[in-house]
Amino acid sequence: MSKFNRIHLVVLDSVGIGAAPDANNFVNAGVPDGASDTLGHISKTVGLNVPNMAKIGLGNIPRETPLKTVAAESNPTGYATKLEEVSLGKDTMTGHWEIMGLNITEPFDTFWNGFPEEILTKIEEFSGRKVIREANKPYSGTAVIDDFGPRQMETGELIIYTSADPVLQIAAHEDIIPLDELYRICEYARSITLERPALLGRIIARPYVGEPGNFTRTANRRDLAVSPFSPTVLDKLNEAGIDTYAVGKINDIFNGAGINHDMGHNKSNSHGIDTLLKTMGLAEFEKGFSFTNLVDFDALYGHRRNAHGYRDCLHEFDERLPEIIAAMRENDLLLITADHGNDPTYAGTDHTREYIPLLAYSPAFKGNGLIPVGHFADISATVADNFGVETAMIGESFLDKLV
């Protein structure tokens, strides 16, 4: 019999809580990640007021320097810890895949100097559109459309760029390159980047609208991932007949593997929370696992190095956390975590190699406190333990610590 009938896992995309032990092996604009600290630096530089997460135990998580504006609770309502990544990567897919029990020992391919001519030529031949070569390099997603959007509006050329992550991104103005055409081109790009030396984690469609000087990316983003190389705990749950619900880009990240209810993409964090609440309220969702990604922290503020916006986004989530808690049933478990860091005060524009926080809450809890510091995959091991299925590759359950 399951200890919890339902588990709801919410990933606050990029909300790291301090540099990982191996952070100096990863860089941002040539600067090692060893001094990165997403929550710590936000708290220190612009202040952070998240009383509802603090109540569960956010301020109790062990750190060399406590969060400046998030106090420890003497009697928290839940359990807390931080988790370390073992996989060789700091991207979204690697983080989520490890959270679900995989160890990525060979990182996907990245292209610091842009994609090879062979790939660009193939995309041109398939699409009938030229590719803007000057954009073919690691680029900020907002800067690349500011720099090349006007040219695309004049010529219809494709904007193809990358980042420090193993991704190929295609930006297209919706009035110039229709969505169905953009998605079709991305599907082709996916088909030619499935093997080394160009094994990419994701192909991302990045549509935008507006006029030069005032471009805005839309919610019609699509991520085309590769399927996980080994079964995850999502697959184990699915095989056991236990319902799995995906909110936001989770279905894309796992390429649908192990997910039998895709609740759709998020237009915003707020929309994602609305969808989660709707999912939690489904009468037929009596037992199972929901998995939500809220990406605005990362996409809108982390990469853009906007500490004030990031803080406000955290405030907005915290203000809605009581709604999520109110939607829980007596034997539900809520887990709040992240997938990597993206320190908005740090060098560069890319993710940072950090610990991730873990907050656990249930109306059924009689106790509270700290869970031992562990690893990302401990989350999936705990989910597997609860529902009586096999774990994936790695992870140790902390289910017995939740009382």
Swiss-Prot record:
Record localization? Cytoplasm
Keywords (A to Z) from UniProt: Cytoplasm, Isomerase, Manganese, Metal-binding
Group of enzyme by EC: isomerase
Entry keyword annotation includes Transmembrane:
no
Task: Summarize where Mn(2+) 1 binds, as residue positions.
Answer: 13, 339-340
Pfam families given in the database record: Metalloenzyme
Q: Which residues cross the membrane?
A: none
As cofactor, the record names:
Mn(2+)
Function statement: Isomerase that catalyzes the conversion of deoxy-ribose 1-phosphate (dRib-1-P) and ribose 1-phosphate (Rib-1-P) to deoxy-ribose 5-phosphate (dRib-5-P) and ribose 5-phosphate (Rib-5-P), respectively.
Task: Name the NCBIfam families on file.
Answer: deoB, PRK05362.1
Similarity comment: family membership: Belongs to the phosphopentomutase family.
Q: This chain belongs to which protein, by name?
A: Phosphopentomutase
